[in-house]
């Protein structure tokens, strides 16, 4: 069966982000159901972020031609489903489970940058509307969190791996569809300049400060990603209610992205980063002390400020840089914010959480506050004016 590129990519994002919407909030709950403690969970999930970083870079580097992208997505999806199914067989052997989680994180993480590479290829090739396709991915994340989160509340946390296996199998099957227009290679005009290294990019003081600031802001979400579900269920909030809390946060993110250009086109990147950092400080400072469901529900709306505003700001910064730098700057952003730093902060959170869940989130607030000291003071949308 053949489908148009827009629908092929939309279905691919649907499968990937629906499974990710179950894995991110609920996999720690599955580990807890297998009798692993909070400190061990923090270590395992923190290590998984390192594997995600390494896997994303490794598998992406293997793609040499555009027509390899879809084949890679199919193989990575199949491997993800097989490894997830195998986790149920090794759940009670820590080291085998650790290896399985590392392998899963490596192969599954590559689906995100490779999928975005396919979107970029089709965007240049046929004018694909990436924004609309990516919104389907965000909506799929909500579907995974809310619908399948509710199912988890019914069947129990011990069956999370089987729900994930089913979703990843669906993701694998829809990858087998054939696009009507295959992705094709094109040689960029500035390809001869596209040899700048990561270290060379970070030698730019402005880029270094922006990347560190964004890494601190995004990294401060570490405890939220790993322990929010565990914490909320420990204070009497049901798994199905927890899924609603995750869902409303992502919904707020989608709404902000939809209106972001209208809201922020005249606001400098520096101000946006200050707004996001301040929101993180406030959100993490109080989240561990609120036990009322509806107050937490309202607090979750701040995800639009703590995550979406920061993401919008860094993407806008990257678009102002030379074309030959953009791909590697995206890699630095994802590697630092969603890999190395969040892995470190997750491991630290795992050591604090058994003693005090509230202080775990307060520590995240302190991390976000540190961003204030590195955010460039005057960095607007299109031109670097001044930094101190």
Curated annotation (Swiss-Prot):
This protein's GO CC annotations: plasma membrane
Entry coiled-coil feature ranges: none
Cytoplasmic compartment residues: 1-4, 67-70, 120-130, 177-210, 260-269, 316-326, 379-388
Keyword vocabulary terms for this entry: Cell inner membrane, Cell membrane, Membrane, Symport, Transmembrane, Transmembrane helix, Transport
Pfam family membership, one: MFS_1_like
Tagged with keyword Cell membrane: yes
Ranges of the Periplasmic topological domain: 32-37, 97-100, 154-156, 231-234, 290-292, 355-357
Family in the record: Belongs to the major facilitator superfamily. Phenyl propionate permease (PPP) (TC 2.A.1.27) family.
Annotated function: Probable permease involved in the uptake of 3-phenylpropionic acid.
UniProt-recorded name of the protein: Probable 3-phenylpropionic acid transporter
